[in-house]
UniProtKB/Swiss-Prot annotation:
Protein's recorded name: Small ribosomal subunit protein uS12
UniProt modified residues of type 3-methylthioaspartic acid: D89
Record keywords, A-Z: Antibiotic resistance, Methylation, Ribonucleoprotein, Ribosomal protein, RNA-binding, rRNA-binding, tRNA-binding
Summary of subunit composition and partner proteins: Part of the 30S ribosomal subunit. Contacts proteins S8 and S17. May interact with IF1 in the 30S initiation complex.
Gene from which the chain derives: rpsL
């Protein structure tokens, strides 16, 4: 335990917390324009073609964002909303596109977990 005199001479140093999603700049979501839509492969031991897109955000950042769900309608110049959240098996992908917002359509024929994929409640 430090004495008061020691604390007067050299105060305690606050820990600096580094953000996992710096491009969002403390906002919940950000809007951007797709510059490239492509597929990439995950790291070992997984195998797939993951759908991702490169996005130029309104604040000037250029980030890679994952497109969740089965099928999508994104292409170059599509305006999308991104949120934080990394994809563990894709290095460098730290953002998710928000389905059902702006130009990104919701997932077709989705029945469960609809809110995460921008799907309205089906008619009974």
């Amino acid at each position: 335990m430090a004495t008061i005199n020691q604390l007067v001479r050299k105060p305690r140093v606050k820990k600096v917390v580094k953000s996992n999603v710096p491009a969002l700049e403390a906002c919940p979501q950000k809007r951007g324009v797709c510059t490239r839509v492509y597929t990439t492969t995950p790291k070992k031991p997984n195998s797939a073609l993951r759908k991702v897109c490169r996005i130029r955000l309104t604040n000037g950042f250029e980030v890679t964002s994952y497109i969740g769900g089965e099928g999508h309608n994104l292409q170059e110049h599509s305006v999308v909303l991104i949120r934080g959240g990394r994809v563990k098996d894709l290095p460098g992908v730290r953002y998710h596109t928000v389905r059902g917002a702006l130009d990104c359509a919701g997932v077709k024929d989705r029945k469960q977990g609809r809110s995460k994929y921008g799907v309205k409640r089906p008619k009974a």
